């Protein structure tokens, strides 16, 4: 049987493909969202370092953050962003495929209670 990684390699699955699939899916559900660009151009940083690739609002007002990955792992700043979202009742989904987003949305809506940072 072929693995997910082997299938992605065969069809040339990239992180941009995942972002496009996820955004199309969120559109189909009527979820307000946008692509969140971050980076550096010359000497100027833009965006919030570590923030998710796609940010949105679910119908109940819950903040949605989707980090898309293909071959790489989350950076330290991305893990910190995830913790901040989850600690404040947001829904964070780490997505290697569209199925990860579908599963996250189905299981989501049950974010953790906020933790006090002392």
Kindly give the residue locations of the regions a language model identified.
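Catalytic phosphate/metal-binding cores of nucleic-acid and nucleotide-processing enzymes, i.e., regions
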Residues: 1-118
């Amino acid at each position: 049987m072929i693995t997910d990684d082997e299938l992605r390699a065969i069809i040339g699955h990239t992180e941009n493909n995942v972002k496009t699939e996820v955004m199309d899916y969120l559109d189909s559900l009527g979820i307000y969202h946008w692509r969140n660009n971050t980076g550096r151009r010359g000497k100027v940083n833009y965006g919030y370092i570590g923030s998710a690739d796609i940010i949105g609002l679910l119908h109940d007002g819950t903040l949605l953050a989707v980090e898309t990955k293909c071959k790489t792992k989350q950076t330290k700043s991305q893990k910190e962003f995830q913790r901040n979202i989850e600690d404040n009742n947001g829904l964070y989904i780490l997505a290697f495929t569209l199925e990860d987003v579908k599963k996250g949305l189905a299981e989501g809506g049950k974010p953790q209670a906020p933790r006090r940072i002392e």
